[in-house]
Amino acid sequence: MESRGKILMERYELGRLLGKGTFGKVHYARNLESNQSVAIKMMDKQQILKVGLSEQIRREITTMRLVAHKNIVQLHEVMATRNKIYFVMEYVKGGELFEKVAKRGKLTEVVAHKYFQQLISAVDYCHSRGVYHRDLKPENLLLDENENLKVSDFGLSALSESKRQDGLLHTTCGTPAYVAPEVISKIGYDGAKSDIWSCGVILFVLVAGYLPFQGPNLMEMYRKIQHGEFRCPGWFSRKLQKLLYKIMDPNPSTRISIQKIKESTWFRKGPEENRILKERTLNENTTKNVAPVLGVRRKKNAHEDVKPMSVTNLNAFEIISFSKGFDLSGMFIVKEWRNEARFTSDKSASTIISKLEDVAKALNLRVRKKDNGVVKMQGRKEGRNGVLQFDIEIFEVTTSYHIIEMKQTSGDSLEYRQLLEEGIRPALKDIVLA
């Protein structure tokens, strides 16, 4: 049914695969009656039910029907069969804004200004309808054939009716590098204020080519986010810097509002003419091999000298999250290319360590605890590529909220992933946030 050229429900001719995620895939398609090009997102019903995504899907449909804006990807219709759910959406042929940034290294302030105005217009519209996106990032921003911005992926959106009696949202969603400090803290938060923060991170990334908050691990990155620790590079205009510091204010009560953003000089007028010439020169001199968004880190005390380096791509997770955990919906995020896995838990550190020891015993693994919060596990016999070893590091965000990272250090990668999938993952299900 889903192969190229096949007819779907006597209405659409399916074409090439546009993308694939954890819970579905997107195909290009053509409406047989109108000849209109569309994108069809296909999701498996059984998988949705299995991982408890049915409420998430209902929310996405409701949200997309509430919003109709020129800078938001439109939902045309929803269809279903016994086994599948189909979202028929507007086809946006220009690709992801993320790809444009990754290819160029960074954008000029002039170009970023245009996209930011369109982003704020779309977000402001959503907020006026009681809808908060909660996962704004360059990968969720598409470009049409005229280079106009389109906001997509309302899978994490929260309606205003989702608020508790205190008027605040209480679920932790979004991609870690773009999420607001109050969301990380797991306290109630204003969905509009958290979206504004994410817009600020996006604007920074567009003009800088790298993230404002970076660290050797998630805990350090979260610390910087919570304290609003970032510096603007020298090529940012003063008015842009001033606006960014107001947007990425770690205190949501003093953070700038969308209305005030619209009234700011940089938003209304854009960068000054003399800065435009400077930015064009900088852009022309940017090498084609500049590392994309997260492949760059600033030197200490020399933030203008940016060099590419390989770091964990924290903003490329395939995340669909609406649980207490950041990015898992009760499951692991496994990054095969780095042989890493990550999950969250609301258990105490001692409970987590005790559980890990039980799992190691059941799987016939040796355990050695370290003083710096790292638990090392290793196999008891040689594998295909030596003895399998991996480190487990526990980060405390709050006393009742921990992030656990697992990294392979030696042995066969295939054996490691098999152990994760068949042994560790199911054994830890009772401590992973659901």
Curated annotation (Swiss-Prot):
Keyword list, A-Z: ATP-binding, Kinase, Manganese, Nucleotide-binding, Serine/threonine-protein kinase, Transferase
Induction comment: By drought and salt stresses and abscisic acid (ABA).
PPI as annotated region, ranges: 338-367
Location of the NAF domain: 298-333
Domain Protein kinase, chain residue ranges per copy: 12-267
Superkingdom in the source lineage: Eukaryota
BP-aspect Gene Ontology terms: signal transduction
Catalytic residues of the enzyme: 135 (proton acceptor)
Cofactor entry: Mn(2+)
Positions bound to ATP: 18-26, 41
The keyword Kinase is assigned to this record: yes
InterPro entries: KA1/Ssp2_C, Kinase-like_dom_sf, NAF/FISL_domain, NAF_dom, Prot_kinase_dom, Protein_kinase_ATP_BS, Ser/Thr_kinase_AS
Catalyzed reactions: L-seryl-[protein] + ATP = O-phospho-L-seryl-[protein] + ADP + H(+); L-threonyl-[protein] + ATP = O-phospho-L-threonyl-[protein] + ADP + H(+)
Entry annotated with the keyword Transferase: yes
GO molecular function, one term: ATP binding
Job of this protein: Involved in salt stress tolerance. CIPK serine-threonine protein kinases interact with CBL proteins. Binding of a CBL protein to the regulatory NAF domain of CIPK protein lead to the activation of the kinase in a calcium-dependent manner.
Domain description: The activation loop within the kinase domain is the target of phosphorylation/activation by upstream protein kinases. The PPI motif mediates the interaction with the ABI (abscisic acid-insensitive) phosphatases.
Protein name (record): CBL-interacting protein kinase 15
